Amino acid sequence: MSRYLHTLLKAIDLQVRSGLANPEIKNLSTDSREIEKGDLFLGLDGEKVDGGNFWAKAIERGACAAIISKKASLLNPPTNEDPVVILPEPVSLFMGKLAADFWGKPSSEICLIGITGTNGKTTTSFLIEFLTTSLGHPSALFGTLINRWPNHEETSKYTTTFAVPLQAKLRKAVQAGVEYGAMEVSSHALSQNRVAGCDFNGAVFTNLSRDHLDYHDSMESYFEAKASLFRSHLIEDGGPRSVINIDDKWGAKLAKELNKKCWTCSLKENSQTREKADLYISNLQIMQDGYKGKLHTPFGVENFISPLIGEFNLMNMLQAVGILVQRGLPLNDLLAALNKFPGVPGRMQLINMDGFKVKEGYPLVIVDYAHTPDGLQNALIASRSLTKRRLICVFGCGGDRDKGKRSKMGEVAAKFADYIVVTSDNPRQEDPIEIIKDIGKGITIDSEISVEPERSIAIQLAIAKAKKNDVVLIAGKGHEDYQILKDQTIYFDDREQARKALSLKTDFI
């Protein structure tokens, strides 16, 4: 795909200055080191350095033109003869729109659904992809674990890819015949305009609880970032195009603002509260391997069976099914497919049932990505429903991240677990012991607790202490296969460590 520079600039409502060359653009690049002849260089402002500072290097290496910020132009001023465009602020917004236009606005060719919230994004997006594919609609998935579409799969580097490569991926997905797309949209992505140029057919708000306050400063700022998905990126046609969890106070606030532009959903047991929602569940029965009940929607009521564990996963299911019904897919077909959903790696993943032959008397071991106070509480409550004896929890908190949530996670663990093993979880530049001390400040009730900074030993300790009918929840890393220590990233997988610890276990009583 190729376009001319002037055409691209006019498409995003920018004036073309006198004397600016009008080269044909072969591709877009944000890395001056990877420029190929005919590329348009987009100098993005990063966390540590402004990529626009390297515009001259990009031109030397064959870029036909460069687009940079005013700040970058002051450091290395271009002449009027240089093929350089200086963008107004916010630069990231214009670059996202430019990338979308270059790739032919691919999001407008599919039913793209954005999922945002603190917890539940990954499971909800996996559900949407699975259900649409099961109904015969080729689908794409963009998120924390993976980016994939027919005949293509790649490990994700970010929950939401940056705008320029994201638009290229969307075009490839469209070329592969995709009809639906499920995209996790993080608050960072919304703040940094990574989804600029994306037209969302639908959106889901899962919940909002404490996380990323090292970046957003306050819950209000965090909420405003999330809410921008619904205010600025949804297609406008006057009808409902979103599903909002009103059991969450921030969701209730957003739903009130959106009014008839959304469907609300609730799991509240109070029937008067629940039945005010557009989507809700009745006749709920807990089974050993999931739930069954009746799912109520504005388009009808159907029986369902869900293989997902935990009440929070009922909300994920309700929202995934709800947004697809809202977009026109048949409720009965969606629920028929739901029972076959294989789950999500590292999300309430039962290790004993994951290719590991269980001996009589083994404890049940669960690995989950829960890394916020609310997420940990949900995972512990779900795990409690599976235990006939003790609930053991292994967890830590990330270094160089929101310190305020550490004591809150300690408080949650002490409240809901019988035995806690506090350990490391990507300590980065911080001392693991200092992080553990911060966690300990929240453990004020009389709790059985062990401290083991070495995560592999902590997992072994928890499983070694577990008896028959105990449940061990290993929280925080989920699907991740690494541990970040100082400037080093080492291979580490909670699931592998759990299987190893189970294989060494000899005491089953």
UniProtKB/Swiss-Prot annotation:
Pathway: Cell wall biogenesis; peptidoglycan biosynthesis. Its cofactor is Mg(2+). It comes from the Bacteria. Its EC number is 6.3.2.13. Belongs to the MurCDEF family. MurE subfamily. This is UDP-N-acetylmuramoyl-L-alanyl-D-glutamate--2,6-diaminopimelate ligase. UDP-N-acetyl-alpha-D-muramoyl-L-alanyl-D-glutamate binds at S32, T159, T160, S186, Q192, R194. Carboxylation is probably crucial for Mg(2+) binding and, consequently, for the gamma-phosphate positioning of ATP. HAMAP family: MurE. Catalyzes the addition of meso-diaminopimelic acid to the nucleotide precursor UDP-N-acetylmuramoyl-L-alanyl-D-glutamate (UMAG) in the biosynthesis of bacterial cell-wall peptidoglycan. One of its GO terms (biological process) is peptidoglycan biosynthetic process. A motif (Meso-diaminopimelate recognition motif) lies at residues 425-428. ATP binds at G117, T118, N119, G120, K121, T122, T123. One of its GO terms (molecular function) is ATP binding. Disulfide bonds: none annotated. It comes from Prochlorococcus marinus (strain NATL2A).
